[in-house]
Amino acid sequence: MPQAIHISPIDNVVVALHPIAKGTLVEVDGLAVTALEDIPQGHKMAVKPIKNGENVIKYGFPIGHATADAEPGTWMHTHNVHTNLSGEVEYSYNPSPDLAPLPKVEPETFMGFRRKDGRAAIRNEIWIIPTVGCVNDIAKKMVADNQDLVTGTIEGLYTFTHPFGCSQTGHDHAQTRKLLAALVRHPNAAAVLVLSLGCENLTHEQFLAELGDYDHDRVKFLTCQDVDDEFTAARDILKKLAAYAGQFKREPIPVSELVVGMKCGGSDGLSGITANPTIGRFSDMMGQRGGSTVLTEVPEMFGAEGFLMDRCIDRDVFVKAEQMINGFKEYFISHNEVVYDNPSPGNKQGGITTLEDKSCGCVQKGGTAPIMDVIGYGDPVVTKGLNMLYGPGNDLVSATAMTAAGAHLILFSTGRGTPFSAPAPTLKISTNTPLAEKKSGWIDFNTGVIADGEKTIDEAAKDLLDLVIRVAGGEQTKAEKHGFREISIFKDGVVL
């Protein structure tokens, strides 16, 4: 079993695949270094002398600079490494010389649902979407009272509550409206009840305008203040929606029609070595099959955005990526926040030292394929291949944004563990085997086998594709079995 990994030949650190005790001789890639102190799993150890102020190199890229001289064998972390990041950057388009679509592969099929508008779906559910937080508990009771309608091919009745829809203004209000309308359009929802109170800022007329053309059999509306008994009214509506949803049956659909979101949260020092590269290889495999993948978490691209921007398929896509990256930095600056106020305490405990360190691991989920499009918050994926989406690093907010963009399911890598799930089925992918064993009720797929030397990234990615096909065909994720699913909306404005 390997002790450590030397990710790039030019790196001056290695990453411990397992805890390394002080005095242990570590041999990797022709290097032989004795650990001068204990090195926790996922953490970095110097394998070359590093001077004060010299860059610390990992993934072949500077992840910060040393704040003290370090001899080979030194533990390199927050006590002796600091970020190099600052504010906005003027980027130039330097497309990778080998920028080209990956060779095509005949797509496999999964057993999914074909909607009347031609779109594919992997779940056949009825959703209740509240337009305002005031009706959250009403929506929950409607779900509880009508579980008998979940029969036949209907796979669930769910609501996604939130605290917004009123006391919002301007762009913040518009953003909420756009996100909720996007959820109503999601193909996994066979039928939708839009539930409002009646006096909120997000009016029925505004929501209809945002939603645009819709199938009146698939989407129904109920305003609680307009009826004597909202529960009786909801029962009548939900019966009609159930009759509509019950007509859909699973049938073979090519994998090329899948949209898969890619997310990491509770990351550790192995995220960029095991789970995220596996997801990246999966993303490339999806692109070869004509499918679509979505990468977001813009603040966690800071410091590594060059890896992605040089892969933009053309200058127009590059300009959109540049505007997205610098726009998010300006968002931080406008709130008097530093752009590099990341990683989290849990990330640091797991071995991630700086935002560059975290970002270099994060972008591994993007694989090697060209970036085909950059889309805004609440906008749908319309281009096949790898897409970048405007969204924060926050797990709940970014996963909700990917669902709203049309992701049928989400791949979520984690080194620390999390039970969270978006409305779209969310597969938890552990970076290390101890987590998979400890939290077997959370974890769907273990890439710790890569660190254990049992499988290669290519082998793990193929296994992951097989799992995705099964989940798309109806196999439940661990979170689905527990009934976990929720949303969080990107808030950027005052509360009236």
Question: Model regions: which residues?
Answer:
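Metallocofactor- and cofactor-centric catalytic cores in central/energy metabolism, strongly enriched
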Residues: 1-409, 416-496
